[in-house]
Amino acid sequence: MVPPPQPSLFQLTFLTGDKPILTLDDEFISSHTKVLLISDASDKIWEVKLDGNRLAGGWEEFAAVNNFSEGNVLVFRHNGEEIFHVAVSSESDDDESDDTDDSESDDESNDTDDSESDDSEDNGEGDSSLVNKEADSSSDCFLRARVTPYSLTKDRLDLSKDFKFMLFDEHNKPCEIYLVNEKGRKWTLRLSRNISSGAFYITRGWANFCSANGLIRGDFCYFKLSESGERPVLLLCSHESGNGHEDKEEEEECPEADTLKICSVGGCSNEKNTPSRFLTQKFTPSRFKTGQLYISMLSSGGLRESGIKKTGEIILLDNDGRKWPSYLNKTGQPGGEWCYIRKGWREMCEANGVEVNDSFVLELICEAANPIFKLHSKIRNKGKGNIVTSKKRALHARTVERTPGVEIDGERGSKRGCTRVSNRSNTYLKGKQPESCSVSDQVANVRQSVLDTLNTIRHFKAELKTRERNLEASLLELDALGERILGISKILNNNLA
C-alpha cells in the first residue's frame, strides 16, 4: 500500500458551488491527476479529477448523491492509493450552533478580536475539562483536552477557565506557547486570553499539531504544563480515542514527570495510571470493503509502550477463547505513524455479532510471543455507548459450538468443523455438550465467505478498470503529442530548405 499523504486526515467546510482544495503534500499532487472518493451513503466509487490540488470534474455529482448541505464539515480520510473516504462530521451542526459566538473572538483576522466576548468559554470548560496548577512547583498536573470539529476547523483550542499561566503577560497581550510531542518535536502557537471571561485559548497551529500527531475528532489528549523557561510549554504525554466515551478515564502515565497529579474539574487523584491498553474501533462500511482496520500508533499509550515498532504477525482473541491469526502492518511518517490489521478481524466481528456501523473495544495483550488483540466488548449503534447486554453475549456464545475451523485455546474443532469450549469460556456454556453442526449452517458459512471474496474482487476490479482507462487516455495523449512533434519537424524542415 502507498503511504498516506500528509496529512492523511483533514476537514473541509462544504459550500455549494465551491470546489474544495485538498490539503495534501506536493508529492501526492504531482503524481496524481484524480482521486477516488467513497462514502457510507453509496457503494459506488466516484472518480473525481484534480485541478492542481482542487477537486474538479465529478465533485458536484458526488456531493449531490451524498446530500451535502451548506456549511457541513466534511471529513476526508486517505484509505490508501488514490482512495479517500468522505463523511459528514456528526457533530458539525451541534458545534456550529453552540459556538456561533466564538467566531467573534477568533483572533485569526486581527489582534483586536482578543478582547471580545466568547460565549463558549463562559461555562469554564471550553475544549478542555481540566486543570488548575497547584502553587507547589513540585506538583505537576495534566491538561485534558478534547479534539472537536470546531477546534480543527477554527484552528483553536479553548482551555478551561480554571487553567492559569503564570508567565502570561499581565496586560493580557497574546504571547507564544510551545506544544511539544513525545518525540521532542516543537510547534510554536499563540496563547491568548479572553478579557471578559478570563479563559485562555491556543490558536495558529492547533490543527497542524493534531494532524502531525494523529489526533482526530473525538480524541482526548493529555498535556503537562511547564513554565520553567521564557515561554510556557505544553508537553503531549498521551492521547486516547474518544468516540463518545467522555467518562472513560484511563489516563496514561506521562514519561516526563516523576510525580504526577492527574487533575479534573472535580478534583485530583494522586494515583499513577498505567498506559491504556484499550482501543475503541468502529466497523465502518469502507473498512468492511477494504478489509483493513486502521489503528493510530498514538491512539493508545499501551500500543506505543508495548514495543510494536514494525509489521508482524498478531493474534485476534475473543472472550470465548477463539483465536484468529492476523497481521499488523505499520506505515506512516515519524510522529504520525499508524497501522492497520489486514485479516481475521472481520471474521472475529461476525462470530461475535459485531455488525457494520457498530463500535467495539480491543484490548492489547503483549504477554505472548506475538501481540494479542482481544475483543473486549461491543458497543451499540447510534453512539449510545452501551455495552452489549449479557443476554446478547449469551446468545453470541451459543454460536461458538457452530463456528467451523476456529481455534479455541490451542485446540482445533472436530472433523465436521465443530469446536469445543474450554473451562475458561463463558459460564453460561459450562456443562454443555458439543452440538453437531447442521449442513445448513455450513452452507451459510461457505456462502458468506464467497460473498466476502466477491466483494473484494469487485472492489479491485473497479480499481483496475479505472487504471485501465487512465492508461488508455495516456496512450491517446502520447499519440497526439507524437503527431504534433512530427508536424513541427516537417515545418522546421521546410523552413530550413
Swiss-Prot record:
Specifically expressed in the reproductive meristem. InterPro entries: B3_DNA-bd (IPR003340), DNA-bd_pseudobarrel_sf (IPR015300), REM_fam (IPR039218). It is found in: Nucleus. Residues 91-125 have a biased composition (Acidic residues). Residues 7-92, 142-239, 278-379 bind DNA. Keywords: DNA-binding, Nucleus, Repeat, Transcription, Transcription regulation. Pfam families: B3. GO terms for cellular component: nucleus. One of its GO terms (biological process) is flower development. May play a role in flower development. This is B3 domain-containing protein REM1. It comes from Brassica oleracea var. botrytis (Cauliflower).
